[in-house]
Amino acid sequence: MKVRVDADACIGCGVCENLCPDVFQLGDDGKAKVLQPETDLPCAKDAADSCPTGAISVEE
């Protein structure tokens, strides 16, 4: 499984980072970055479901 963030869709709200700080971090550009794309996938799925713009995808 892989976790990805669509930087064009990300608005930098920080929901993903708050839910999964080991997986996501807001970068210098204010957009979410994936720190560990293959770690804590249940948490990453929760973040994807909570992302207001649908910028996070979890591919199985």
Swiss-Prot record:
The lineage of its organism: Bacteria, Thermotogati, Thermotogota, Thermotogae, Thermotogales. Monomer. The keyword Kinase does not apply. [4Fe-4S] cluster binds at C10, C13, C16, C51. The keyword Disulfide bond applies. InterPro entries: 3Fe4S_ferredoxin, 4Fe4S_Fe-S-bd, 4Fe4S_Fe_S_CS, Fe-S_cluster_ET. GO terms for molecular function: 4 iron, 4 sulfur cluster binding; electron transfer activity; iron ion binding. Disulfide bonds join C20-C43. Residues 2-29, 30-60 form the 4Fe-4S ferredoxin-type domain. This is Ferredoxin. Binds 1 [4Fe-4S] cluster. Pfam families: Fer4_15. Ferredoxins are iron-sulfur proteins that transfer electrons in a wide variety of metabolic reactions. Keywords: 4Fe-4S, Disulfide bond, Electron transport, Iron, Iron-sulfur, Metal-binding, Repeat, Transport. Its cofactor is [4Fe-4S] cluster.
